[in-house]
């Protein structure tokens, strides 16, 4: 008997997207899932728009940063890792990578994100 105060949990272990959703007979499950997907997409888009990558050289940085002179990227958060990996970086958390940040096109990333959510909604038939 799973009990929680969180109405849903979304995980993606090893890239396998999994939804844990509490279901009640008085709630329309399809519209509920549509609201969850809309919320998740809105949150991700907002996070992408508000994300800032440090470009000054800092010793012992705890946040992701990029040195435009050397082309070295320090990846220390999931959002940076996801975006640069989308553009071919193959980065890992808490590591340095040589990467050309001019390859990034956030509009292309956001379009792919929107397309992914449409595919998920179609798959779930919501």
From Swiss-Prot:
Subunit structure: The DNA-dependent RNA polymerase used for intermediate and late genes expression consists of eight subunits 147 kDa, 133 kDa, 35 kDa, 30 kDa, 22 kDa, 19 kDa, 18 kDa and 7 kDa totalling more than 500 kDa in mass. The same holoenzyme, with the addition of the transcription-specificity factor RAP94, is used for early gene expression.
Reaction catalysis annotation: RNA(n) + a ribonucleoside 5'-triphosphate = RNA(n+1) + diphosphate
One term of GO molecular function: DNA-directed RNA polymerase activity
EC number: 2.7.7.6
Keyword line: DNA-directed RNA polymerase, Nucleotidyltransferase, Transcription, Transferase, Virion
InterPro entries the UniProt entry points to: DNA-dir_RNA_pol_35kDa_poxviral
GO BP terms, alphabetized: viral transcription
Record organism: Sheeppox virus (strain KS-1) (SPPV)
Gene Ontology CC, one term: virion component
Pfam families: Pox_RNA_pol_35
Main localization (coarse): virion
Similarity field: Belongs to the poxviridae DNA-directed RNA polymerase 35 kDa subunit family.
Location(s), subcellular: Virion
Known role: Part of the DNA-dependent RNA polymerase which catalyzes the transcription of viral DNA into RNA using the four ribonucleoside triphosphates as substrates. Responsible for the transcription of early, intermediate and late genes. DNA-dependent RNA polymerase associates with the early transcription factor (ETF) thereby allowing the early genes transcription. Late transcription, and probably also intermediate transcription, require newly synthesized RNA polymerase.
Highest taxon in the source lineage: Viruses
Protein name (database record): DNA-directed RNA polymerase 35 kDa subunit
């Amino acid at each position: 008997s799973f009990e929680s105060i969180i109405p849903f949990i979304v995980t993606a272990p090893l890239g396998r997207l999994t939804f844990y959703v509490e279901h009640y007979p008085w709630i329309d499950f399809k519209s509920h899932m549509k609201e969850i997907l809309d919320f998740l997409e809105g949150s991700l888009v907002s996070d992408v728009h508000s994300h800032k990558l440090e470009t000054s050289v800092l010793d012992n940085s705890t946040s992701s940063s990029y040195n435009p002179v050397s082309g070295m990227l320090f990846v220390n958060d999931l959002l940076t890792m996801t975006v640069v990996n989308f553009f071919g970086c193959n980065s890992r958390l808490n590591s340095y990578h040589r990467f050309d940040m001019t390859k990034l096109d956030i509009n292309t990333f956001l379009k792919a994100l929107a397309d992914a959510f449409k595919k998920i909604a179609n798959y779930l038939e919501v």
